[in-house]
Amino acid sequence: MIIDTTEIETINSFSKLESLKEVYGIIWMLVPIVTLVLGITIGVLVIVWLEREISAGIQQRIGPEYAGPLGILQALADGTKLLLKENLIPSTGDTRLFSIGPSIAVISIFLSYSVIPFGDHLVLADLSIGVFFWIAISSIAPVGLLMSGYGSNNKYSFLGGLRAAAQSISYEIPLALCVLSISLLSNSLSTVDIVEAQSKYGFWGWNLWRQPIGFIVFLISSLAECERLPFDLPEAEEELVAGYQTEYSGIKFGLFYIASYLNLLVSSLFVTVLYLGGWNLSIPYIFVPDIFGINKGGKVFGTLIGIFITLAKTYLFLFIPIATRWTLPRLRMDQLLNLGWKFLLPISLGNLLLTTSSQLLSL
């Protein structure tokens, strides 16, 4: 039997092409993920810098100014310092839970960004249940905090973990009910559909005006979920040293630091998507394209404008939680639980019933 060498070469070339296609397919899948991770990292660095500058302004002092221009590289300097510190592990604690806890907290929050639309269909995963995917994923983070507190074998850490779990359960329900009210107005659980539903009537079509009570409840609940003052009981310094972070150092302590700002950023992004119209400007932008001769209907220009508007709304909203940190005193644990169960839960239920009734009457 004579084997034609040209046939063998043809088969080999086809197999190489198939393998190259697979490699390119994998690279094409990784590009948006890597881009999103880099964007989130830069966003967190900007939040840290903004918080320090705003805090310095509120307290009438000078903020960071030596690490880079206007101190913008101070967060990188702090991160480098944490990387170089020794990673201590308690000898009497559960080392597995102690090591896994910070990773669970960070990864669960990172996954929430996959359903956030930064522009017109510029979203990593346009799921039909996008908003409830975020709620389900965000409820995993307190599990990591509880594991960290238990694995530290420290009474302060364990109490901090228990507080984090109790606080998350108390405020997750009002948050979910507010999201359900928004979904009823938009007839969809997709984040993209919710933004598009707000674009029909421009500025006055934002859910902020249609759901003012839900917006206030969502704001308070998201602050509690982020463990920001006045809801930072899981890491209250005067009572629990540093809560579930007490025994941590080095990169693991840095992961908790990153997780808190990741959670703050994702909550602000969801406020923008659910209540502030997302990527829609709602104001005609004729002046800038006409000056530079840019096609306003172009896809690239529209995408860039959408990203800019989403981030601008998000960072403007971030002033509220940053200013709140230096304005309000910390609540007691009983006050925190009473606020969640006795006030926010009935209000969010009433808001949901009103929304349902209005939707039924409009049919």
Curated annotation (Swiss-Prot):
PROSITE patterns to which the protein is assigned, alphabetical: COMPLEX1_ND1_1 (PS00667), COMPLEX1_ND1_2 (PS00668)
EC number, as in UniProt: 7.1.1.-
Classification via HAMAP family: NDH1_NuoH
Major localisation: plastid
Its biological purpose: NDH shuttles electrons from NAD(P)H:plastoquinone, via FMN and iron-sulfur (Fe-S) centers, to quinones in the photosynthetic chain and possibly in a chloroplast respiratory chain. The immediate electron acceptor for the enzyme in this species is believed to be plastoquinone. Couples the redox reaction to proton translocation, and thus conserves the redox energy in a proton gradient.
Subcellular location: Plastid, Chloroplast thylakoid membrane
Record GO biological process: aerobic respiration; photosynthesis, light reaction
Signal peptide coordinates: none
One of the record's GO cellular component terms: chloroplast thylakoid membrane
Alphabetized UniProt keyword annotations: Chloroplast, Membrane, NAD, NADP, Plastid, Plastoquinone, Quinone, Thylakoid, Translocase, Transmembrane, Transmembrane helix
One Pfam family recorded for the sequence: NADHdh
Membrane topology: Multi-pass membrane protein
Reactions accelerated catalytically: a plastoquinone + NADH + (n+1) H(+)(in) = a plastoquinol + NAD(+) + n H(+)(out); a plastoquinone + NADPH + (n+1) H(+)(in) = a plastoquinol + NADP(+) + n H(+)(out)
Family membership: Belongs to the complex I subunit 1 family.
Record InterPro entries: NADH_UbQ_OxRdtase_su1/FPO, NADH_UbQ_OxRdtase_su1_CS
PANTHER family found in the cross-reference section: NADH DEHYDROGENASE SUBUNIT 1 (PTHR11432), NADH-UBIQUINONE OXIDOREDUCTASE CHAIN 1 (PTHR11432:SF3)
Residue stretches spanning the membrane: 30-50, 98-118, 127-147, 165-185, 203-223, 248-268, 300-320, 336-356
A Gene Ontology molecular function term of the record: quinone binding
Protein name per UniProt: NAD(P)H-quinone oxidoreductase subunit 1, chloroplastic
Subunit structure: NDH is composed of at least 16 different subunits, 5 of which are encoded in the nucleus.
Natural source organism: Solanum lycopersicum
